[in-house]
Swiss-Prot record:
Ubiquitously expressed. Residues 876-885 have a biased composition (Basic residues). This is DNA helicase MCM9. It is found in: Nucleus; Chromosome. The gene is Mcm9. Its EC number is 3.6.4.12. Coiled coil: none annotated. Keywords: ATP-binding, Chromosome, DNA damage, DNA repair, DNA-binding, Helicase, Hydrolase, Nucleotide-binding, Nucleus, Phosphoprotein. It comes from Mus musculus (Mouse). The lineage of its organism: Eukaryota, Metazoa, Chordata, Craniata, Vertebrata. Residues 861-872, 1090-1099 have a biased composition (Low complexity).
Amino acid sequence: MNSEQVTLVGQVFESYVSEYHKNDILLILKERDEDAHYPVVVNAMSLFETNMEIGDYFTVFPNEVLTVFDSALRRSALAILQSLPETEGLSMKQNLHARISGLPVCPELVREHIPKTKDVGHFLSVTGTVIRTSLVKVLEFERDYMCNKCKHVFMVEADFEQYYTFSRPSSCPSLASCDSSKFSCLSDLSSSPARCRDYQEIKIQEQVQRLSVGSIPRSMKVILEDDLVDSCKSGDDLTIYGVVMQRWKPFQRDVRCEVEIVLKANYVQVNNEQSSGMVMDEDTRKEFEDFWEHYKSDPFAGRNEILASLCPQVFGMYLVKLAVAMVLAGGIQRTDAAGTRVRGESHLLLVGDPGTGKSQFLKYAAKITPRSVLTTGIGSTSAGLTVTAVKDSGEWNLEAGALVLADAGLCCIDEFNSLKEHDRTSIHEAMEQQTISVAKAGLVCKLNTRTTILAATNPKGQYDPKESVSVNIALGSPLLSRFDLVLVLLDTRNEDWDRIISSFILENKGYPSKSENLWSMEKMKTYFCLIRNLHPTLSEVSNQVLLRYYQMQRQSDSRNAARTTIRLLESLIRLAEAHARLMFRSAVTLEDAVTAVSVMESSMQGGALLGGVNALHTSFPENPRAQYQRQCELILEKLELQGLLQEELRRLERLQNESVHQCQSHSLEEEVAPGSCRNDPRDKPRLRTSTQQEQSCSWSSTERSGADSPPGPGLNRPTSCNNSAENRDGRGDGLDWLDPTSSPEIAPESTIVSPNVKTTEKNVNLKISNNKSQGKEKHGPQQRSKLLEAGHLPSSGAMNAPLRSHGVKRTKASQAVVVSEAGRGDEEDSVPRRLPKLLKEGSQNVCRSTTRVRPLPPTVPLSLSIPSPGSGKRSGTPKRKRRKSAQVEEPEPEGMETPTVKLAKFTFKQKTKLTHSPEGQGPIPPSASEIAVDSSKIPQQRTRREAAVPVVAPGKSTSTSGDRCSDQLHGKTKELSRQPPDSNPPREEREQGPKRRVIQPKPELGNQAGHSHLACEKDRKEGVSCGNKSSKVHAGTIARLASFSFTSPSESKSESLPPERKDSRDSRDSRDSRDRCHSPPATTAPVLGQQRQTFQLQQPTERANLSTLSLFTLSELDDEALDFDWEEEMRKKP
C-alpha cells in the first residue's frame, strides 16, 4: 500500500469509529490500567458499507490494513479524550486493538473447514473446536541493536514466519556509509515490558458433525496474542477471524525446511452459549407456537408427530423415540445456596440384541444436536474420553477427550460394554458431577463435561429377564445407577414382527419417498435448540406425583438398592422437566409427571408399580389422549391419588368434548366426509413414510376399554378420528399401553397400513358423499383409482349402491348396473392361471374328506364363550337393535348433524340391512367390488327351516359378521368378525352367490389374502354358487367344511365370543373354509383354534401375535358393513 492509500484507510476508519464506537472508547478511557490491551470489536459489514474501497484493501492487504486500523483507533481515542470538557478519571490508553468480526457470509471469507495453502495471506473466518491449549508465554517482539563501528542504534522486530526469531541485518542500516556487520544487542540483560506481549497457541479441529461419514477431521494451530490469550478453553466451539500465514524454522544445512500453515487470530468468538449456530428469530418461534396452538385440544397428538419425525427410518419403537426425545430436551441445571451444582442433563442407556436399531438412534441424535461427539467403546480409552496429556515441542499440554469436546452437548458412545473396566470408572465423575479433575504431567486442572450421554450396548450372551440388568450387560451398579433410563430392546424372534419390519424395509428400498407431514432434520434441530432455552417450573401437583412415586419405589420389596436412592428422584424431576420442554410448556404439569413416571416404569430402572416392558415392540398409539387417560388411571390409582385422578379425568373429558365439536364444525364448514378432524395428523394424505404408519396404523393395544371410558360423544362416534378405544379389554396391571406383544391377552385391533396412496382422502370422501354413502373412507384406494382410469370399473355410485349402511335406498336401476357388469368379471382377473386349477382340486379333496362338525364341547375355554369385560359392561341389547332404537328415540340437533347422521334417517325399503362395525372403526365402502343381492328369489322352504332355528337370548353382547368379498377385492387379508344371533348366513350365502361380481386388483408385495374370483370359479365348478341360481349346497358339506378355521390378524383375540347358533357358525365357517383354501397358510392365526378339531395350524402362544397384514395394503374393510339383518327380513314375511 502507498502512503495515499494508508491515509485514506486511516481517515475513513477514524471517522467510522468516532461515530459508531464512541461509547466503547469512553469505557476504555475510564479504565485504570494503562498498560493493558483493550479491544474494540468492529463489524465488517457496516464498515464496508461506509466505504467499499476499504473492503478491497482489507481483502488484499489484511496485515497492513489491520496495523493502520490500530493507529487510527488510537488517534480517535485521543481526539475523543481532548473533546471532553472534563477529563477527570480518564486516561489515554496506547494498547488499543481493532477486532474485526461479522464478515460477509461467502465462500471466499467464511470457512467451515481448515484453510489450505491457497488461502495464505487472506483474512478468513474459520469455525472449529478447541482440542488443545498451551500455556501462556511471554513473547519479546522487539529488540534494539547497536552497530559496533558507527554506534548507530536501530530496532529489529521478530519475524512471525520464522517462529518469532530475530534476524540481524547483513549490514548496518545507518544512512552513513557504514558497512559493518557486527552488532551488539542492547536488551540482552533485561527486556522492557513494553516490548513483550502475551502469547498462546491453541489447536482447533474441524467440527465432526459438519463432516461427511468417513472423513477424518483436520486440525491447525491458532496464534493468540495480547487480549485474546486465555479467551477459550479445551472443548469450546470457536469462530476465529484472522489471517492465514505460513511459518518455518530457520534454515539449516542439509535439513529439509518444513512449512506450517497457522492462523494468526484477530478476534475469537466463543459459540458455547449459542452452540446451535442458528439465530432464533421471532418467525421461528411463532411457527412452533402456532403448531402447539393447533394441537391445543390434543397436545399428545402434536408430540407424537414430533416423535414420528425422530429417526424416521426406524419403524415403531414409540417408547425409545419418546425417551430419546426427552433426553435430548434435557432438564434444568440448578445450583443451590451452598454452591452445589445439580446436573440437568439426563443419561440414557439402550440395551438390546444386535439389529434392534440402537446405533440408528445414536447417529440421528448426534446429527440433530449442534454440539455432539459420536464414538465407540472399543476404540476409546479413558484418556480418549476424558483428557490426555500430550508433550509437544518440549512441554506438556492437555488435549481434550470426547466428553470434554461434547461439553453442553451430546456424547454418543456405541458398544458401551466394550470399554475396559478401568476406563469405565473414569467417567463416573463426568456423568454425575459434570466435571473432570486432571492431575497429569504436573498439570492439575478441572474441566467441564456438562454433556448428555447416550450409550448403547449389547447384553452379555442371551438376555435373561430373571437376572438384573447389571448381570446381563456386565456393568457395575455405580455406573449403571448414573443412567436415568435403561431401556431393554429384546429381539423375541416374533415371526409376524419380522414380516412387518421386512415389508417396511423393502417398501422404503423399492419406493423411496418423503412425507410432507414429517419434520425435516433442520426443523428438528431448530426445535430442540429452542426448547433447551425454556425453564419450566415444577407445579404442586407434579411434585405430589413424583414424591409419591419415589416413596413407593423406596418401599417396594423388589427395589434395587443401588438404584432407589435420591438419584431416582432427581431423575424423575429431570424427565418431567424434559417432557415439559418437549411439549413447549413453561410449567411442569400433571401430564409431564405421569409421562415421566410411565417412562421410568417401562425402564429397567423402574418397574416397582407395573413391571418393565420390552421397548422394541412398542408402537405409536392410535389415540394418544386415550393412552394418556389409561396411564393416569393405572399410575394414579397405584399411587393412591384418587383426587388428582378424578380431576384429571374431568379435564380430559372437557378437552375431548371441545375437540369433537371442533371436528363437527370443520366437517360442516368444508362439506367433507364426517370424521375428518383437522387437528389430527392421521387425516393428512398418507405417503410412504413411517410417520403415517406409526401414528395411525399401529397396533392399538394402547387404547382403553369401553367400560373405562367416560361417556363422551368422542369415544362412541363410529366416525371419530380412527378411535377404537371403546372396544379394548382393560387389563388390571402392566404396561399394556406400551407393549402390544407382551401378553397373549393383547392382540392387534388395527393393522399396519401401507401409506402407498395416490388418491387423497378428501377426494375419496367427496366421491362417497356424492353417492350418498354413509361409510367412511379412511384411505384412498389405489387399485380402484387405477381401474377407474383404465375404464374397467363402473361408476362409484354403482359400486357403492349395494353397500349403504343404515338403509339407503337402492333402486332397480342401480341393481341393473351391477348385474350388467357381471359378465365382465372374468376379464378383469390378473392372477396366474395355474392357481384356479390347484385350488379347485384342493377344495374337492377337502369336501370329500371332511366330516360333520361337532357341537361345542363342554371344555371350551371361557374366552370363547363368555363376553369380555369390556363388552360385558355394555348394554344388554344387541348393538344393531340399540342403534335402531337410538336413531328413533335420541335424534341429534339439526345444527350438529353430520352428513352421516342425516343419511342415517333415510327409511330402509329393501330387505337387506347394513350396520356399522361394533369394533369402533367406521365401515368402509369397498372401492373395487359390486355385490348385488336379489332377496325376492329366496326359496320359501329354506326360509321356513331357518325361521324355526331357536334364537339366542338377546342379553348377550354380540358382534356382527358380513360378506368377505369386499376385503378380497382390495387384495388384502380378510377381516373375520363374530356372527350375531339374529343373522342367517346360509341364506345370505346362497342369495348372494348368483349376484356377486368381483374384480380382483393385481396383488402387491406382501399381500396374503385369498383371491375372490378363484373362490367364485371354484364354487361355480362345484355347483355351489357363481352361475347357477337353482343349485343348492348340501347341508353336510357346509357342516364338514366348518372344520376349517380362519381369522384375520386385525381381529382382537382379547375379546371373547358370545354363544352362537349352530347354523350361523356352520355357514360362517363354510365361507371361511373356502376363503382359507385360497389363502397362504402363513397368514392364519389360531384365534378359533381351540374350538376346531382338525386342520389346526398352531396354538395361541404366550406372546400375542402381531399383525400379519402387509404394509402395502391400503385400507381395512369392515365385514360388518356387509352384514344383513335376516331376522328383520323374516319378521316382515307372513
